[in-house]
Amino acid sequence: MRRLTRRLALPIFGVLWITVLLFFWVTKRKLEVPLGPEVQTPKPSDADWDDLWEQFDERRYLNAKKWRVGDDPYKLYAFNQRESERISSNRAVPDTRHKRCSLLVYCTDLPPTSIIITFHNEARSTLLRTIRSVLNRTPMHLIQEIILVDDFSNDPEDCKQLIKLPKVKCLRNNERQGLVRSRMRGADIAQGTTLTFLDSHCEVNRDWLQPLLHRVKEDYTRVVCPVIDIINLDTFNYIESASELRGGFDWSLHFQWEQLSLEQKALRLDPTEPIRTPIIAGGLFVIDKAWFDYLGKYDVDMDIWGGENFEISFRVWMCGGGLEIIPCSRVGHVFRKKHPYVFPDGNANTYIKNTKRTAEVWMDEYKQYYYAARPFALERPFGNIENRLNLRKNLHCQTFKWNLENVYPELRVPPDSSIQKGNIRQRQKCLESQKQKKQEILRLSPCAKVKGDGAKSQVWAFTYTQQIIQEELCLSVVTLFPGAPVVLALCKNGDERQLWTKTGARIEHIASHLCLDTDMFGDSTEDGKEVVVNPCESSLMSQHWDIVSS
């Protein structure tokens, strides 16, 4: 009997031990959620979403600011408000990704991100559609929060009412701060380990966030952007953009989209591969929060809007990071032809201040080409940059020459950066810009004898780009035919209507081979006040001009 007991003891003990282990394993499974990369937060069902949205009275929110029949639908927001309000906030958009994007697999443990959206007097329909597209097309476990920063809009309720929506928080500035300082405020309270900046008139596309977060998780020094599709400002149709584009710029620090070169396209074996970009558009990107803080966040002394994308792009590349456009991430954006809001110091002055700060801190000796392209920036105040210069020094950043050689070798360095600046005289009179009925016109006026606003309207700059500039405006012909008026138009590099050369005493328009003339009737009288182009004739005094340095 004792032998039998001894024989059975070991098996019984083993069974009991296994039973205990099973009990604790099952109990633990009931009490704990498994941790690690296998965790998946289920997306709410359609019914759950309906319950969440029932707490928010969408119709009441939109109707409070609805377009009224008889009003100009473009007046308030510089896009078709009537059409925007006609479209559902929950509309479907076409999947514009390459078909191979749907085959890609991303990390299962991507970190949740803080989505920061700043706005000033945004249309409620576009703001709501931006948020709803994010909630509809983003796994909920990847959204830490959606931080709205209301930059002192006229109606605080534009933002306040939206906190009823899932994940949404609302901050309001007590005075107008502009894009940079508003984004900084959102970033400072963000709880996510990554920051996702969006504009307030966007619609994100399918699986837009995962490829962005995946690249940042692989390398925290990457700053990544989606391909930006177009939402038509008139019809609000969602239009696919070309995927093989990158951001570029000229020496005036004007952003421009550019096609990849044939060589760059040939090296792309996979259409889903990230695209290195010298600069980002600045409205939509993802960055690691700790990296953002380490790099110095934004230059908070930049005002309202414009130029901040150059500053952060130069800083990222020159201080150890990189910029990428991710083809499998798509976000639609309403591109407007003008700003619907007011710049306290004027659009041009604000942009020059911001880009001048960028040039002075980051462009080293190459800033001379910025001033050659924007000669009137030399006189503009730009604030104190000591903190930003110290930041660059402490980060041990590369030179701008390194940036040109390694990041953007396609940007040609001009052979000459000299500027000829002064009055354009014809005998005792000077070429002058005058405002009439909200338009800038040209005429000959007595030359100003003292400095002041009157004198400034008679100062012109000849640049290496072969443009004749005053502030942000250039001399431009209306047509290429004799007798065509010469007007002031926004400068655009490479525009043949704005290219001139000084030949002896004449100022010749390059494309038409016509000369700047004040005698619109060709009779050499003193009565011709309109500035035109006519066939060049050395004997005509109305085509004789002297450039007198101011």
From Swiss-Prot:
Family matches, as InterPro entries: GalNAc-T, Glyco_trans_2-like, Nucleotide-diphossugar_trans, Ricin_B-like_lectins, Ricin_B_lectin
One Gene Ontology MF term: carbohydrate binding
Cysteine pairings via disulfide bonds: C101-C328, C319-C397, C430-C447, C474-C491, C515-C536
Domain Ricin B-type lectin: 415-548
A Pfam cross-reference name: Ricin_B_lectin
Entry keywords, A to Z: Disulfide bond, Glycosyltransferase, Golgi apparatus, Lectin, Manganese, Membrane, Metal-binding, Signal-anchor, Transferase, Transmembrane, Transmembrane helix
Membrane topology: Single-pass type II membrane protein
Catalytic activity: L-seryl-[protein] + UDP-N-acetyl-alpha-D-galactosamine = a 3-O-[N-acetyl-alpha-D-galactosaminyl]-L-seryl-[protein] + UDP + H(+); L-threonyl-[protein] + UDP-N-acetyl-alpha-D-galactosamine = a 3-O-[N-acetyl-alpha-D-galactosaminyl]-L-threonyl-[protein] + UDP + H(+)
Pathway membership, UniProt: Protein modification; protein glycosylation
Cofactor: Mn(2+)
SMART domains: RICIN
Listed EC numbers: 2.4.1.41
Chain residues that bind substrate: D151, R176, S200, W305, R336, H339, Y341
Protein name: Polypeptide N-acetylgalactosaminyltransferase 14
Origin species: Mus musculus
